[in-house]
Every structure is written in C-alpha cells, then in structure tokens.
C-alpha cells in the first residue's frame, strides 16, 4: 500500500505541475505583460481540453501503442507518448511572447493543454486501478499532496524565478523538468510492485455512437436523472474557486504586491495551506462519509472568500494577505480532496478512465468556460462585488448536494 501511495503522490505532482503550465503560471505571465483583464478571463478557455477529455478516454482504455506497450505496458506507454509531446510544445512556447503574438501564443498553449489533459486522464485512471475503494479518501489526500507540490514548483517557483529570469527561460526549464518526471515515473511504475486491478476493457466497438457508449458505461452508477444531478453538482461546486483563480494574479498585482510577495505568500503559502487542507480533509474523511465532508468543507470554504473583500477594503497588507491566502487555501484543499474522492468513488467496473474523465470534465467546464466572464465582472462591478459573487454562488451547489444525498438515502 505504501508503494502505491508513493506512485499516487508522483501522479499528483505531475498533474499539478502540468496544469500550471497553461493555468495560473501562464495567467501570471499574461498579467505581467499587462494583457487586459477581459482577455485574461477569455483565455481561461485554454484549459478547455480538460473539459472534453472524457471523449478521448475510451482510446486510452482500449487502444494499445504497438511498440511502447510491449516495453512499458498499457498505461505507461500512453504516459510516455504524452510526455514527449509536452516537452516538445512547451519548448516551442518558451520562444514566444504573448504581447507580440497573442494568437500564436494561445494556440500553442491550447495544444499543451490538450496533451496535459490527456496525461491527466491516464494518470487518474491508473490511480483508480491501484487503490481499493475503501482507501480512496486517504489516497485522494496523498494525490492532492503531490498535486499541490507540483503546482508549487510550476507556480510559486516560476514566479520567484521571474525576479531573475524571463518567462521564456523559465518555460525552457519546464520542458526539462517534464522529461525528468517521465524518467522518475517509468522507474517508479516498473520497479515498485503493487497490486493492480486489471479488469480494464481492452476492446470497444468503434461503430457505437459515443453518447450511447457513455450511457452504457455510466449505467452501473445510476439513472440518467441521478447522473445529471451529479454533473450539475460537479460543475457548480468548483465554480467559485475557478472564478477566483483566473483573477487572483491581476488582483494581487492591482494591490501592488511584488513578485516575491506573490510567490512567497500568494503562492508558496497558498500551496502549503492547500497541502495541509488536503491531508486534513483526507483524515476527516476516514471518520466522516464523503458527502457530509463535501457539505461541511463547502460551507467553510465559502466563508473564506469573504476575506478577499476585507483585503480589498484595507489595501496592501502582508499580515492580512497571509491570513486570507491561508484560510482560502486550507479550506480549498479540503474541498478539493472531498471532490476528488467523490468522483473516484463513482468509478467502478470496466472503463474507469472514461468514467473518471467524464465526471472530472465537469470540473474542466467549470474551470474553462464559465470564468471567461470573470474579467468583465471585475471591470464592470469592481473587485468587492466580484468576491461577493464568488461567495454567493456556492449556495446552489450545496443545495444540489443535499438533493443527491437524499436520493442516495432513499
């Protein structure tokens, strides 16, 4: 079990690192280049591949890469392929500047996001195969620990390095690190022996309609109405965080925090808080069921958003920033752990990759599509109303969660 958890931690690190490349780190790069808030919000669409990766998951479940599969095995061969693609395109991005050619910059970033989301899908499926259902809560905490650590390297580390290096140089370093992670993963998976659930479907009928196929693989989970309810919850629950994440860098720069303060408090302390929150959330879920944990964590996290309003009123204040980021990150780590544990608990039987990707894609929709209006909200209504909005929109998700809980208890 301990070996499996080590591999899961590495899975999390790689996923967290990759998503920052086209996520918050890219967002900070755009903000530093004085790209308009409306444009920054619109470019959250770069992470759209995370919303539709479930469409490609059947390929990862069923299709073997002829030569790599013999050497590395089914999942690891796909990981190798996507990692090499990421190294290549991240290196290309390191020669571009968003201010000079925003369209080309965004296009390459979108390609990186596509391969990153593919790899995230494969790693997530791999994770559901090597952990038994009873350990999902704790394993999710370990995964989030690694995920946040990867985010720390690619986000806080990059912003701190931007004091001394250009972002073009930093993204060249990213390309090298992705290759190193691949080597570590190959060694870890090949030489750490663990029990793996091997009931993964290897063939599928390519003539089947994709929607009929998805309907069939989701059938063991529940009725169509119940699944729709779950999808609505998955979209709404992460919506407040995703709005904030798109605008947090412009907000901190607006308050005149410098790169060192943003890297150390806004990012490093934020990730540390999220790691603590993830582990704390995993520990609590060992004693409390997943749905009750999601409800409790969601309420606490919503209250933490109010601190951003207080920070805006007081202006630049290092102590208040420390408290705000700490409260936001710890409670956010708890909600994320419960969220992932909930998704993982839904996956069962064959085609786990497709099931997990389909549900986690709702998180992608929440992260990529709805936040495109975040910049417009800030420009037209101000920062205080923006953060008030992110607090209020937590309520619908919790009401849907109660509906799900009632259906499960019937």
From Swiss-Prot:
One of its GO terms (molecular function) is transmembrane transporter activity. It holds the Pfam family MFS_1. PROSITE patterns: MFS (PS50850). It is found in: Cell inner membrane. The chain crosses the membrane at residues 5-25, 40-60, 76-96, 98-118, 141-161, 169-189, 217-237, 265-285, 290-310, 320-340, 356-378, 383-402. The keyword Transmembrane applies. GO terms for cellular component: plasma membrane. It is a multi-pass membrane protein. Keywords: Cell inner membrane, Cell membrane, Membrane, Transmembrane, Transmembrane helix, Transport. Its main location: membrane. The keyword Kinase does not apply. Belongs to the major facilitator superfamily. This is Putative transporter AmpG 1. It comes from Rickettsia bellii (strain RML369-C). The gene is ampG1.
